[in-house]
Structure formats: structure tokens, C-alpha cells
């Protein structure tokens, strides 16, 4: 087989719709655009959300709330994630979490939640730990060091 002999699989391609090629084609004369009007023109049509002269929905609705610029965004992990990725006796910190692929970037810190079971004794050094997560880590023989 050569490069010039390659063909697409049978039935995987479709011929383009040929517009304006006579009334017998089914899409002749006005090419499926009807008669005159904004939608019949080249580049015609309205932008998304445009409702004619009516006030658009986005502007009819009241404004609400604000964005807190001091909000902290934690990377959230569960104890089951630690169970899957770490060996017994390991130290769980930013570097080790990055190495095993649990975090890609550190936003404002890492928080561990208590979903799942933990059987390995781990030393966890993160910013926040939920009460249930802390109980499970200690019950498995590990330590929690909140930085």
C-alpha cells in the first residue's frame, strides 16, 4: 500500500451539500434561505442572546452577589486517594502528592477529606484536614501535621 492509494472507509464520508445549482437540485435559487430578510443575507443572522427589540433575558434578571477576591481555593483529596497512591509509612506532603500525580498545581493549599478507608500509617503534612479524615489517619497509626 502506498500513500496515494489510501482511501477513507466506506460510508465514512459524505458529499457536501451543493447550493444554488438549479431548482431540480432541491437547494437551488434561494439555497434554503427563504426570501429576503436578515437571515437571507451574506453574514446575516443575529448574535446569540439577541431577542429583537425585547430586553434580553440576561439584562432582565437582577444582579446578585459578588466575587470574594480573598477566597481560598483548596485542592481537595480524600483518604482513599492516599490509600491507593502511597506506601505504608510514607510522608504525604506537597512534593510527594505532586510526584504521585494527585496534584498538578498548588492553589491555596491542600485539604484532606474522609471519604474511603485507610489501612496504611501515613504522616500527613497539609494545610487542612477534616475531622473524619484526621480520625481515620490516626486510627490507621499515622500522624496529622497541619501546616
From Swiss-Prot:
The keyword rRNA-binding applies. Disulfide bonds: none annotated. SUPFAM superfamilies: Ribosomal proteins L15p and L18e (SSF52080). Signal peptide: none annotated. InterPro entries: Ribosomal_uL15 (IPR030878), Ribosomal_uL15/eL18 (IPR021131), Ribosomal_uL15/eL18_sf (IPR036227), Ribosomal_uL15_bac-type (IPR005749), Ribosomal_uL15_CS (IPR001196). GO terms for cellular component: cytosolic large ribosomal subunit. One of its GO terms (biological process) is translation. Residues 1-58 are annotated as: Disordered. GO terms for molecular function: rRNA binding; structural constituent of ribosome. Keywords: Ribonucleoprotein, Ribosomal protein, RNA-binding, rRNA-binding. Part of the 50S ribosomal subunit. PANTHER family: 50S RIBOSOMAL PROTEIN L15, LARGE RIBOSOMAL SUBUNIT PROTEIN UL15M. This is Large ribosomal subunit protein uL15. It comes from Desulfitobacterium hafniense (strain Y51).
Amino acid at each position: 500500500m502506498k500513500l496515494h492509494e489510501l482511501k477513507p472507509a466506506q460510508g465514512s464520508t459524505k458529499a457536501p451539500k451543493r447550493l444554488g445549482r438549479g431548482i431540480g437540485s432541491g437547494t437551488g435559487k434561494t439555497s434554503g434561505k427563504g426570501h429576503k430578510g436578515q437571515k437571507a443575507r451574506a453574514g446575516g443572522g443575529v448574535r446569540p442572546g439577541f431577542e429583537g427589540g425585547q430586553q434580553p433575558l440576561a439584562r432582565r434578571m437582577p444582579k446578585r452577589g459578588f466575587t470574594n477576591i480573598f477566597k481560598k481555593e483548596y485542592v481537595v483529596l480524600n483518604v482513599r486517594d492516599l490509600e491507593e497512591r502511597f506506601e505504608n509509612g510514607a510522608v504525604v506532603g506537597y512534593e510527594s502528592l505532586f510526584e504521585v500525580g494527585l496534584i498538578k498545581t498548588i492553589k491555596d493549599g491542600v485539604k484532606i477529606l474522609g471519604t474511603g478507608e485507610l489501612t496504611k500509617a501515613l504522616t500527613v503534612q497539609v494545610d487542612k484536614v477534616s475531622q473524619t479524615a484526621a480520625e481515620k489517619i490516626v486510627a490507621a497509626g499515622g500522624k496529622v501535621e497541619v501546616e
